[in-house]
């Protein structure tokens, strides 16, 4: 049969047309699959993953990866994206952190969660600021970081805000007539007490001359006697729980009736081993965590997160992960990813220059509470939780 006549028959033309249609559909489907597979949002995870503080970084790593797994794929601007977590260890070293930030920029991350510490965050922010890439720290608390660039945001309460919350409690709940502030001679404690005194003074509450002490069993009695002479109706002591136990025991033994307040370092279950329950009764601790996350929380979102975190962690058993459960900053890391993605969705873009304005005006209810940022990237109104010793146990105030 003549081949030219065969190719020109109606049957052949129809068959060839059907073949072309099927091939076109096949290629279109595969092209779309390839395109969707290539649409990726890179989220940087910069933290300390080596050395003695690696647990902080592992906490962040698991939380960020868990959030990415919950959100992927995410639809933004009419396209579906997978979230790829780009993790780098800055070793908790500011010099290394600066280099890691540059590497993150080179890899094209659209946003960054990190860094773990104040120093590493301070070193990293200028790099991200120059490239216009938002960075959200779940754990760095130095207030001086705020406003160092237009791209820095902070998920956790900062050191000034935590003191302001302590002052707010003292002013509105205690209303002391004669208060003394005591530090334990450590840098953190001295800074906290100094700022607390300033905030109280600004609100019309003058304090007695602050005390700076390094307490031991021998000195505790002498210090207590000096306090008895001063006669304060309220004592705020920024110190570890064993130091708090030693001082409050002597103060109560000599009969000084006073409100006794501490903060995070002073709240620990082991304090009941070191002091008689009668002396600890009424001891107050103001903790820089929202009620949803603080000890004994039954908040559904928090409980669900802790459950999901542990399940995800169990899937990583073969990896070199040392932590056994979520730490303090895990929820802040988790919510940081959600907030970035929420800003992208609102802007219909994964580009930093497009979504950063939505991030600045975000209003989001996360595990850590309601999330909004002020003009310098700090959380607006982050909450603290107050505990009191009642019948030999810590309970919500």
Which residues does each PLM region occupy?
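Extracellular/periplasmic bilobed ligand-binding domains
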Residues: 126-130, 193-291
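Extracellular/periplasmic periplasmic-binding protein-like sensory domains
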Residues: 248-334, 388-396
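Hydrophobic alpha-helical segments within soluble ligand-binding/sensing domains
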Residues: 97, 155-179, 190-191, 218-221, ...
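Beta-alpha junction/loop-to-helix N-cap segments that form part of ligand/metal-binding clefts
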Residues: 35-36, 40, 55-62, 74-146, ...
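Extracytoplasmic "Venus flytrap"
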Residues: 44-65, 88-94, 117, 185-190, ...
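An alpha-beta-alpha
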Residues: 49, 152-215, 233-234
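Segments of small-molecule ligand-sensing domains
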Residues: 315-396
